[in-house]
Amino acid sequence: MAPNLRKSHPLLKMINNSLIDLPTPSNISAWWNFGSLLGICLMTQILTGLLLAMHYTADTTLAFSSVAHTCRNVQYGWLIRNLHANGASFFFICIYLHIGRGFYYGSYLYKETWNTGIILLLTLMATAFVGYVLPWGQMSFWGATVITNLFSAIPYIGQTLVEWAWGGFSVDNPTLTRFFALHFLLPFAIAGLTLIHLTFLHESGSNNPLGIMSNCDKIPFHPYFTLKDILGFTLMFLPLTSLALFSPNLLGDPENFTPANPLVTPPHIKPEWYFLFAYAILRSIPNKLGGVLALAASVLILFLSPFLHKAKQRTMTFRPLSQLLFWILVTNLFILTWVGSQPVEHPFIIIGQLASITYFTILLILFPVIGTLENKMLNY
């Protein structure tokens, strides 16, 4: 009998073992769809981004008008731009849900997969930040100024570091040029990291909603989960296209329709919605260095998850107290997101400070304590 090319060809064999004959737990739920959705998001963003880059000019005098030109004069340029801008939002929705799933079901116990995932998140955040600067509107310019300025809080080398990043003494043409270069490069770095992420995942195999060994009950990825993933793609593309076609500017800032002007500061500088929770934590501390450290900690704290897991059970499926705490944490993140979009005045300042304290308390103290308590209740 002739050998099956899919199983014998050196390249096809790798694809086959990752996407076709991959043994998959039979009981994984729709929460396991977000990994493939993130892959689709990345491909969509790279494709639309490439098409936009063909019409974009990374120069302070031309950037804003080149984006306007793309939307007005390029065939379907408006659609490509709207899909790219809103695609970023969906990318973050998917990654936050993906991380939330990992946290709820104890997937962070696969340390290598979890750590590469956090590095992916940080790279995605960097990509989104430099990308937001490119249209060179008011919020692009001032967002870049404010966020890059945070590095000046680093003792001794801070100011030098910022001027080195800017390529001058303020955000100007060299900054825009290098941000465009970075925005073009980083998505390919994300694609490379994704392969590492998947390699680590396939070393151990997928986790499942029960958090138990599933080796005795595995099914092939194709056709079961390929079909399930296609359903996921459809359910994501529907709201994405609806948003891009019906209200493309819903999530954007009106301030960005004004070309960048270093002499006029917008009344309220704020990042895109997906960074607001971290921005709220940054603002909640009155000291600059303290704020920067809290901002970094808000994401880097995820690295500690495997070490803060004290429960004998892996997932939260049968741990009602941890479930309650988890949903309080989710609510708290929504509160932080809302506070980040509000001006710095009473009562938002105190709400932001309380929500920031709660965020760190839940993750660092309450989760390990409740996990230990649940062990005691179950007589472990």
Swiss-Prot record:
GO terms for biological process: mitochondrial electron transport, ubiquinol to cytochrome c. Keywords: Electron transport, Heme, Iron, Membrane, Metal-binding, Mitochondrion, Mitochondrion inner membrane, Respiratory chain, Transmembrane, Transmembrane helix, Transport, Ubiquinone. Its cofactor is heme b. One of its GO terms (molecular function) is metal ion binding. Heme b b566 binds at residues 98, 197. A ubiquinone binds at residue 202. GO terms for cellular component: mitochondrial inner membrane; respiratory chain complex III. It is found in: Mitochondrion inner membrane. Binds 2 heme b groups non-covalently. The chain crosses the membrane at residues 34-54, 78-99, 114-134, 179-199, 227-247, 289-309, 321-341, 348-368. It comes from the Eukaryota. Heme b b562 binds at residues 84, 183. It is a multi-pass membrane protein. Component of the ubiquinol-cytochrome c reductase complex (complex III or cytochrome b-c1 complex) that is part of the mitochondrial respiratory chain. The b-c1 complex mediates electron transfer from ubiquinol to cytochrome c. Contributes to the generation of a proton gradient across the mitochondrial membrane that is then used for ATP synthesis. PANTHER family: CYTOCHROME B (PTHR19271:SF16). The cytochrome bc1 complex contains 11 subunits: 3 respiratory subunits (MT-CYB, CYC1 and UQCRFS1), 2 core proteins (UQCRC1 and UQCRC2) and 6 low-molecular weight proteins (UQCRH/QCR6, UQCRB/QCR7, UQCRQ/QCR8, UQCR10/QCR9, UQCR11/QCR10 and a cleavage product of UQCRFS1). This cytochrome bc1 complex then forms a dimer. Belongs to the cytochrome b family. Heme 1 (or BL or b562) is low-potential and absorbs at about 562 nm, and heme 2 (or BH or b566) is high-potential and absorbs at about 566 nm. This is Cytochrome b.
